[in-house]
Amino acid sequence: MGFSSLLTTCRYLLYSGAGNSFILGESMPSLEDVLFLCQEEMVDGFLCVESSEIADAKLTVFNSDGSIASMCGNGLRCAMAHVAQCFGLEDVSIETERGVYQGKFFSMNRVLVDMTLPDWKKAERKLTHVLPGMPEQVFFIDTGVPHVVVFVSDLSKVPVQEWGSFLRYHEDFAPEGVNVDFVQRKKDDLLLVYTYERGCERETLSCGTGMLASALVAADIFSLGQDFSIAVCSRSRNLIKIFSEKGKVFLEGPVSLLNRSENFGWLEPKSRRFG
């Protein structure tokens, strides 16, 4: 299979997956590198794309605090776009901590991944204690990483940082903690979602697994049927499409290549290939 790395003249690339921003490299970074790079570029994480014996490539996702995330939906789509362009592929497979994910690269505006898991571990929960004005009923779901979905009537009135931090460390979800998604239903097939991400410890402009979690819970509680299609808008105002078809659930949206490390100003270009 022919391979042409996008990193032949630089060490890192800066990607955005519908507003989720990442540094991408093709060798395993040190913890110090992850912390420095994420802080310097103010990004949500580091994507390490390497060779795989069971897929087109292997992806390791680092949160901006240096911890490893078992899954990142928008990061996975960025990695798929990167690998698709390196190998000249349309169908792409990526090995992750949660198994091998299959995706399809149509264009940078349309990168799709099959996010189906055998068990989403969905459960409605009543919180043991809440902050003033916060709903008591929430929904837990695992879309590769754990999420708590909170439906509200008006997202503009939600203090995302305060409520998000409170729920992320809530004793009901200890010790691992959760990502927190605040959701407003705009139409039958349109959700507005703001996410506080574990590992970033703040609200991010977009979160693929959070948008997926919100759509899956909405499909259940609003009885949208087994085969559904929901558009999800994040803080970045990018739209992600979540749809179910023949028992599988897909995440689809745009990916952008924002910058290369020779333009970052603080790195020397260095050739690097995985494989």
Curated annotation (Swiss-Prot):
The record marks 147, 197 as: Could be important to modulate the pK values of the two catalytic cysteine residues. It catalyses: (2S,6S)-2,6-diaminopimelate = meso-2,6-diaminopimelate. It is found in: Cytoplasm. InterPro entries: DAP_Epimerase, DAP_epimerase_AS, DAP_epimerase_DapF. GO terms for biological process: lysine biosynthetic process via diaminopimelate. HAMAP family: DAP_epimerase. Catalyzes the stereoinversion of LL-2,6-diaminopimelate (L,L-DAP) to meso-diaminopimelate (meso-DAP), a precursor of L-lysine and an essential component of the bacterial peptidoglycan. This is Diaminopimelate epimerase. It comes from Chlamydia trachomatis serovar D (strain ATCC VR-885 / DSM 19411 / UW-3/Cx). The lineage of its organism: Bacteria, Pseudomonadati, Chlamydiota, Chlamydiia, Chlamydiales.
